[in-house]
């Protein structure tokens, strides 16, 4: 239901974005604290960040948390054992940061990757959800002036990477 409401807000242009400067490590620690107890048995959630806790982004923290939570929830659906690792790293282009969520799950086929951000697309028919979450994530990240990409290897796992500018107007 929330995904359908978000999709409606996106399409009507009524989804609000509140840009402000936010401490990225604190934002990600908050996500970790709320998500770690939701992991399936045998799956460990790992937060990986540089030592400094002084990374700030001008972004909408509510929407960014929504995206990271969605990516972690998706990873948990397809990871029966192992790790879901998320965090951030500086991009090779100065002024940008990469936020990532990677898992040791079942992976996504090349065909699946081609369609993964399409509305209503689901990798299989057995998982919950309407197939809207990743499409909504992509739209939110674009509104945050960023990009989202995916790499995957079947049976080895998947990595979603969100690339955002440190500052935007």
What would you call each of these model-derived segments?
Residues 8-19:
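Helix-loop junction within the histidine kinase core
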Residues 75-76:
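Short helix-loop "hinge" at the ATP-lid/N-box region of the Bergerat-fold HATPase_c
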Residues 18-33, 46, 65:
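A conserved beta-strand-to-alpha-helix junction within the catalytic ATP-binding
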Residues 133, 137:
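Short alpha-helical Gxxx[C/S/T] motif in the catalytic ATP-binding
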Residues 38-48:
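Short conserved segments within the C-terminal catalytic ATPase subdomain
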Residues 108-120:
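Short conserved segment of the HATPase_c
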